């Protein structure tokens, strides 16, 4: 890969820092109140946000332009087959990025889904950081 200019390098670090913060918030909230539907929804939101930001960090590093989107499937497609193939469950998080935040549109987070969301977001993190470490 081509070296990044300082601005893109800073953006890459920002994406990762923000994703790390989202994942940490999700973990803490799940530990505090996974028995509460609204808390589970917030956990799902932060997991979706974390996965989205990790993927945007990867796309930034690969110098692949991406639209303003919360669509994990689209971001995976832009990242390419090896990444998309290694994270088949990641697109499950997409509805938790927007729809879950508004009344009437929510994809329901069932008990246990918060753990699944955290696991998927963690898998995205691990995959992205492994790729970035090779560069």
Tell me the role of every PLM-derived stretch.
Residues 1-135:
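Terminal alpha-helical segments
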């Amino acid at each position: 890969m081509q070296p990044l200019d300082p601005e893109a390098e800073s953006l890459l670090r920002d994406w990762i820092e923000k994703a790390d913060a989202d994942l940490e918030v999700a973990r803490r909230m799940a530990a505090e109140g996974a028995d509460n539907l609204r808390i589970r929804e917030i956990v799902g939101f932060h997991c979706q946000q974390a996965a989205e930001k990790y993927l945007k960090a990867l796309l930034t590093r690969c110098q692949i332009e991406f639209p303003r989107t919360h669509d994990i499937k689209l971001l995976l497609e832009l990242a390419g087959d090896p990444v998309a193939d290694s994270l088949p469950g990641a697109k499950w998080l997409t509805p938790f990025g927007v729809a879950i935040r508004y009344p009437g549109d929510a994809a329901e987070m069932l008990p246990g889904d918060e753990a699944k969301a955290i696991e998927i977001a963690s898998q995205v993190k691990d995959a992205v950081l492994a790729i970035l470490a090779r560069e």
